[in-house]
Amino acid sequence: MSATALQVKTTQKPNSRLALEVAVPAERCQANYEAAVTRLSRTINLPGFRKGKVPRAVLLQQIGLVRIRATALETLVDAVWREVLEQESIEPLCEPELSGGFDALLESFQPGEALTLILETDVTPTPKLKATKGLQAEAEVVTFDPSKVDELIEQSRKQLATLVPVESRPAAIGDIAVVSFSGTYDDDGSAIEGGSSESMDVDLEDGQMIPGFVEGIIGMSLGSEKTVDCHFPDDYSKEDARGRKASFVINLKELKTRELPDLDDAFAQQSSDKATLEELRNDLEQRLQEDAKRRDRSNRHDALLEALTEQLEVDLPNTLVQQEIRNLVEQTASQFAQQGMDVKSMFTPELVRSLMESSRPEAEERLRRSLALTALAESEDLKIEESEISAKVKEVSRELSGERDIDPARLRQAVSDDLLKDKLLDWLEDNSTITEKVLESEAKTSKPAAKSKGSKTKSTKTKTNKAKTEKPASDKTKS
């Protein structure tokens, strides 16, 4: 073994962290010290001496031993770190942390004497799965509901409706009420911030306002005044109003009703690019069916991924967790920016710290799911062929032909990741048992209604025919 060779002892620590205890020979320490002296003598400027011609004794006196030792140690630690990575075939996730700190190590560093230092770093974890086949998962079923077609058409009719004044009857559900109002809290009589208006349009539909407000307007006559009791929900957006009772003095100034357009071809042409009402209905039905299939598939895949993640054994490195947390916070900031908000003034250091803390559980769960899929791909040797990736890249590139600043390498990686994820989830679906569950609220809307009391479940073995799980769980939920 060379006199300057490094001896390394590796210790695995929690959270996928490695501690590398490195024994640096005395000759190596002395050589680094001498190199530091030479380097400083060439670069330092001292009065009365030409650059690079400063005598060693003068240099030591002017700079001091501590600075020279510190310079030597810095270069030594950096060189040792790079050499250890290559020698031990380690791929770190972050820069090394010197155990005990630099100052403590500097005190023990003496040229001509051996030195032991400990470097710590996070490394990519090795995820393992206790099982990959025969997993049990439960997924909520999503089926096409024909009544949604009528709901969408009615929404369009409302948007295209003509508002007609009402004078001869009281306010009713579905009307548009123009009101003035002022509100106070019942507990202390204080005015509600933002709780007054001289004129506001109120759509008299359930859920449009806080509980009690719309209900109080129903039955009022034009020009009348009424005090209405309301209750702010516990999850109301303004914290100081949550759960509090309030009273509003309401004046009904105007009342309007919607005059809906006839359901005919003219309506279809006005509300869409379809020529006839039949074409509009067929288009809406097709889109809703496709959406139901997508959501149903997404539910199954989410359930399978959750079941797979339960089989995962892994130590999450803090470096990856922090990276995922930053991604989540950046996504939140991007969403606010897209809504036109001033992100720079909104995202104070305090808010960022709070968001990072609250985002940690989600970040860890996302990491666990990603690592579970990675482990599945390795365990079952599932890959995507280059030809598949290239074909998909061409398809996506055509769709993004008008976009600028597209990084081909990043696009290819994103396409590859998506294709592999789909393949892994399809494999899971073929090798797992999914219990499909229809919630009571959805069962009531399925046909025939009389046969859909309570929750219904059906166990579907998706081992031989994947297409079977693309269908509703039971004929009773078909429409």
UniProtKB/Swiss-Prot annotation:
Listed GO molecular functions? peptidyl-prolyl cis-trans isomerase activity; protein folding chaperone; ribosome binding
* Compartments where found: Cytoplasm
Q: Taking every annotated instance into account, which residue ranges of this chain make up the domain PPIase FKBP-type?
A: 174-261
Bias kind Basic and acidic residues: ranges? 467-479
Residue spans with biased composition (Basic residues)? 453-466
Enzyme Commission no: 5.2.1.8
Please give the record's comment on domains.
Consists of 3 domains; the N-terminus binds the ribosome, the middle domain has PPIase activity, while the C-terminus has intrinsic chaperone activity on its own.
Q: Quickly give the catalysed reaction.
A: [protein]-peptidylproline (omega=180) = [protein]-peptidylproline (omega=0)
Put simply, this protein is called Trigger factor
Any one of the GO BP annotations:
cell division
Q: List the NCBIfam families.
A: tig
By its UniProt entry, which SUPFAM superfamilies does this protein fall under? FKBP-like (SSF54534), Triger factor/SurA peptide-binding domain-like (SSF109998), Trigger factor ribosome-binding domain (SSF102735)
By its UniProt entry, which PROSITE patterns does this protein fall under? FKBP_PPIASE
Region Disordered, residue ranges: 437-479
User: Could you name the domain of life of the organism this protein comes from?
Assistant: Bacteria
Species, as recorded: Prochlorococcus marinus (strain MIT 9303)
| Function description | Involved in protein export. Acts as a chaperone by maintaining the newly synthesized protein in an open conformation. Functions as a peptidyl-prolyl cis-trans isomerase.
UniProt KW keywords: Cell cycle, Cell division, Chaperone, Cytoplasm, Isomerase, Rotamase
